[in-house]
Amino acid sequence: MELVPVVLDLIGIFVFALSGSLLGVRIQFDIVGVLVIGAVTGLGGGIMRDVLIGAVPPASFTDWRYFAVPVVAGLVAFRFHPDLAKIEPYINWFDGLGLGLFCVLGSQKALIFGLDPVPAVLMGVLTGIGGGVLRDLLADRKPIVLRADFYAIPAFAGSLVVVLTWEAGKFHEWVLIPAAALCILLRFLALHYRWSAPRATDIW
C-alpha cells in the first residue's frame, strides 16, 4: 500500500476509535465494552466496504496495525478519560475528522477494485458512515446519519472529488488530502451552524 493512504487510514481509525471509546466511557461501558465499541467504530466501515467489493480477507484482518490502533485509542480513552473530559463535547468534531479520511479512502479502494463511479462514491460514503452507525447501534441510540444531521452529504462530496479526478485521469494519492479536507470542512461547518439534511416535515 502507498504511504499516504496507509497513514490517512491509520489516523482515521484512531480518530474514529477514540470517538467511539469516549462514548463507551460516557455510557459506563467496562474496559471490554470500551475496546469493543472503539474497534467497531474504527474498523466497521472499512470491513463492510472490503467485504462488498471483494477485498477479502479485509485489510483489518491482515495487517496488525489495523487492530493495534483502535486498541491504543480505547486504552487512551479508558485511562485518561478524566483529562479528555474537556474535549468530550467535541466528540462529533473528532467523528468529522474520521468521516473525511474514511470516505476518500473508501472510494479510492473501490475504484482500485474496478467499481464504476457511482458505486465507488457509495462505497466511500459507506466507509465513512459505517463505523459510526455500528457505534450508535451498540450504544442503543439512533444512528447519527438517520437523525437529519448533515453527515452523509459531506462524505458524498469528498468521495465525489476522488471519483471525478480518477475518471478525468488526474488522480494522485495526494488528491486524497484536499478531498478529505472538503468533507471535514463541510462537516465542521454543519456542526458550527447546526445544518441538517431536509426532512419531509420541513418541506410539506
Task: Report each predicted region and the residues it spans.
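Intrinsically disordered, low-complexity non-transmembrane regions of multi-pass membrane transporters
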Residues: M1, W195-W204
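Helix-coil boundary and interhelical linker segments in multi-pass alpha-helical membrane proteins
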Residues: M1-V4, V51-F61, L105-A120, L164-V175
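Structural signature of hydrophobic alpha-helical transmembrane segments
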Residues: E2-I13, P58-V72, D116-G128
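The first (N-terminal) embedded transmembrane alpha-helix
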Residues: V6-S19, I37-V40, G158
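C-terminal ends of transmembrane helices
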Residues: A17-I27, D50, L75-E88, V133-I144, ...
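Cytoplasmic-side transmembrane-helix entry/capping segments in multi-pass membrane proteins
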Residues: V32-V40, D63-A68, E88-L99, M123, ...
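Short, structured motif recognition centered on aromatic/hydrophobic residues
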Residues: V36-V40, I47-I53, L122, L126, ...
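Small-residue-rich segments of transmembrane alpha-helices in multi-pass membrane proteins
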Residues: G38-G46, P70, F94-Q108, L126, ...
